[in-house]
C-alpha cells in the first residue's frame, strides 16, 4: 500500500521544476496530525477536556484541545523554512514568521486547528482544516495582511484531518482529492481513498434544523423540499447532522449530500469563517466534483474583507447545491 510520503514524492516528480517546498509543508501537517491524533485518543485520561476559561477572537469559549491544537500547529509550521506566516481561527491577527528564513519563505497557512471541538467531551468526531497560499508580498520582507486576504481561487492546497473511528488526512493541490488513513501500528498514513469523487446526486442533507425559524425563506423551502415524498427524485432525503463541519462534509463527500450553514436572524452574515473553513472546504468540494456557494455566489470567488469574515455555506453534491441555490434566488429580494 502506498504511503503518504511515497505519494507526495511521486506527485512532486511529475513537476520537474518543483523544489519540494509544498511537499515539506504537507510533511509537517502529517506530523501534527499524528500528534493531535495521539492526544485526542487519550483526551479522557488527561486534563485536556472541557473549556480553558479563555475566549477566542470570535467571543467563543476556547476548549483546552483548541489551544493545544493551535499551539501544536503553530510550532510545527514555524519549524518549516517554507512557511512565511500563519493565521488561525484562534488568534485575532496573523503571525509573521519574522526571521531570515520566514522572510524568504513563499507560503502562508490559514487554519481552523480543531473544528467541532465542543464535541470532544462526548467522543464525537472532530477535525483540523488547513489552507495554503503563495504569498503576494515581496520575498525578503515579513508577510502582510494582504497575503492572507486572497480569494479562495488562489489556494495552492487545502485539506482536513478527521479524527474519528480512524484518523484520515484528505487534501488537494488542485489536481483531484486523495485520502490517507492513519495506521497507528506502523505510524504511517496510507493511501486509502484515491481520486475521491463526490456523487453528483445525493440523498443526505446536513443542517441544524433546531434553528429553522431563524433561517431565510429559501432555506426553509429547501428543507421542506428535502422532506417531501417524491419517488422520481428519491425523496424524502435523509437528515444527518453531526455538528462538526469536517465530519459532516467527509460523510457527504463519500456518500453524496449537502451541508448547509446558512445565515440566520441571529447571525445575518453566516457563522462559518470564509478563510479558515469556507475556502478550504470549497476547494476540496470543487476538486471532487462538488459545488460550494454562499447561497448565491461561488465561495472561491469571494474577495475577503476581514481576517475573520463569516460566510453562509452551501456545499456538497452538484445537483443538491444547485437546487438549494435556485430556492435562495427565488426569495432573494425578501
Swiss-Prot record:
Its EC number is 3.1.3.11. GO terms for molecular function: fructose 1,6-bisphosphate 1-phosphatase activity; magnesium ion binding. The keyword Cytoplasm applies. The keyword Magnesium applies. InterPro entries: FBPase_C_dom (IPR044015), FBPase_class-1 (IPR000146), FBPase_N (IPR033391), FBPtase (IPR028343), Fructose_bisphosphatase_AS (IPR020548). Mg(2+) 1 binds at residues 89, 112, 114. Pathway: Carbohydrate biosynthesis; gluconeogenesis. Homotetramer. This is Fructose-1,6-bisphosphatase class 1. It comes from Haemophilus influenzae (strain 86-028NP).
Amino acid at each position: 500500500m502506498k504511503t503518504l510520503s511515497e505519494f507526495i514524492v511521486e506527485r512532486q516528480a511529475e513537476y520537474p521544476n518543483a523544489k519540494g517546498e509544498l511537499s515539506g509543508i504537507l510533511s509537517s501537517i502529517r506530523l501534527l496530525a499524528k500528534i493531535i491524533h495521539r492526544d485526542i485518543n487519550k483526551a479522557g485520561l488527561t486534563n485536556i477536556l472541557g473549556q480553558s476559561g479563555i475566549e477566542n477572537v470570535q467571543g467563543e469559549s476556547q476548549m483546552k484541545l483548541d489551544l493545544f491544537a493551535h499551539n501544536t500547529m503553530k510550532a510545527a509550521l514555524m519549524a518549516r523554512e517554507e512557511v512565511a506566516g500563519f493565521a488561525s481561527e484562534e488568534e485575532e491577527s496573523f503571525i509573521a514568521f519574522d526571521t531570515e528564513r520566514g522572510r524568504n519563505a513563499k507560503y502562508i497557512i490559514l487554519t481552523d486547528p480543531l473544528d467541532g471541538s465542543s464535541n470532544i467531551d462526548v467522543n464525537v468526531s472532530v477535525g483540523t482544516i488547513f489552507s495554503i497560499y503563495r504569498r503576494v508580498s515581496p520575498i525578503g520582507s515579513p508577510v502582510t495582511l494582504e497575503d492572507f486576504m486572497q480569494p479562495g481561487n488562489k489556494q495552492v492546497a487545502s485539506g482536513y484531518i478527521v479524527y474519528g473511528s480512524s484518523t484520515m488526512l484528505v487534501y488537494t493541490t488542485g489536481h483531484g482529492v486523495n485520502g490517507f488513513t492513519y495506521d497507528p501500528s506502523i505510524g504511517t498514513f496510507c493511501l486509502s481513498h484515491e481520486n475521491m469523487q463526490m456523487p453528483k446526486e445525493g440523498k443526505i442533507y446536513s443542517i441544524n434544523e433546531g434553528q429553522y425559524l431563524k433561517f431565510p425563506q429559501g432555506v426553509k423551502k429547501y428543507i421542506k423540499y428535502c422532506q417531501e415524498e417524491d419517488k422520481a427524485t428519491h425523496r424524502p432525503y435523509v437528515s444527518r447532522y453531526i455538528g462538526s463541519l469536517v465530519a459532516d462534509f467527509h460523510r457527504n463527500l463519500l456518500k453524496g449530500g449537502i451541508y448547509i450553514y446558512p445565515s440566520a436572524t441571529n447571525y445575518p452574515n453566516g457563522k462559518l469563517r470564509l478563510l479558515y473553513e469556507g475556502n478550504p472546504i470549497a476547494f476540496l468540494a470543487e476538486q471532487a466534483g462538488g459545488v460550494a456557494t454562499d447561497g448565491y455566489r461561488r465561495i472561491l470567488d469571494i474577495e475577503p474583507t476581514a481576517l475573520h469574515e463569516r460566510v453562509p455555506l452551501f456545499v456538497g453534491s452538484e445537483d443538491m447545491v444547485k437546487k438549494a441555490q435556485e430556492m435562495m434566488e427565488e426569495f432573494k429580494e425578501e
